[in-house]
């Protein structure tokens, strides 16, 4: 199981590709990995902000790319897509930006 530091290092090393190919403006980890509560069965929750909003195909391509890159199932969420104020607040409290 990867640590949060290892995950951040991997994402940092691939920032250029994330920016150029997927138009990623910012990326942050939240959820169990951010709280150091992950288990072997945990996925990793990633909040992403784009320079240009991708179509669905590109969005799921990015999710698959990140899952393959990290070796962990990624649950990708677009910044601004969460409308429920309680969920939004909970996510914001966890955020670890890369």
From Swiss-Prot:
Amino-acid positions noted as binding Mg(2+) 2 in the UniProt annotation, renumbered to this chain: 43, 45
Cofactor binding summary note: Binds 2 Mg(2+) ions.
Keywords linked to the UniProt accession: ATP-binding, Magnesium, Metal-binding, Nucleotide-binding, Nucleotidyltransferase, Toxin-antitoxin system, Transferase
Enzyme class: transferase
Binding, Mg(2+) 1: 43, 45, 75
Reactions catalysed: L-tyrosyl-[protein] + ATP = O-(5'-adenylyl)-L-tyrosyl-[protein] + diphosphate; O-(5'-adenylyl)-L-tyrosyl-[protein] + ATP = O-[5'-(adenylyl-(5'->3')-adenylyl)]-L-tyrosyl-[protein] + diphosphate
One Pfam family linked to the record: NTP_transf_2
Cofactor dependence: Mg(2+)
Motif (GSX(10)DXD motif): 31-45
SUPFAM superfamilies tied to this protein: Nucleotidyltransferase (SSF81301)
EC number(s) per entry: 2.7.7.108
Molecular-function GO term, any one: metal ion binding
Subunit record text: Probably forms a complex with cognate toxin MJ0127.
Function, in words: Probable antitoxin component of a putative type VII toxin-antitoxin (TA) system. Neutralizes cognate toxic MJ0127 by di-AMPylation.
Family that this chain belongs to: Belongs to the MntA antitoxin family.
Record protein name field: Putative protein adenylyltransferase MJ0128
Native species: Methanocaldococcus jannaschii (strain ATCC 43067 / DSM 2661 / JAL-1 / JCM 10045 / NBRC 100440) (Methanococcus jannaschii)
Lineage: Archaea, Methanobacteriati, Methanobacteriota, Methanomada group, Methanococci
């Amino acid at each position: 199981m990867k640590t949060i530091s290892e995950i951040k290092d991997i994402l940092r090393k691939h920032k250029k590709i994330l920016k150029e190919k997927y138009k990623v403006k910012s990326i942050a980890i939240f959820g169990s990995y951010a709280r150091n509560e992950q288990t072997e069965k945990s996925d990793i929750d990633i909040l992403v902000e784009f320079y240009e909003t991708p179509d669905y195909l590109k969005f799921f391509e990015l999710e698959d790319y990140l899952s393959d890159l990290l070796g962990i199932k990624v649950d990708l969420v677009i910044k601004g897509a969460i409308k429920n104020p309680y969920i939004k607040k909970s996510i914001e409290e966890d955020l670890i930006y890369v």
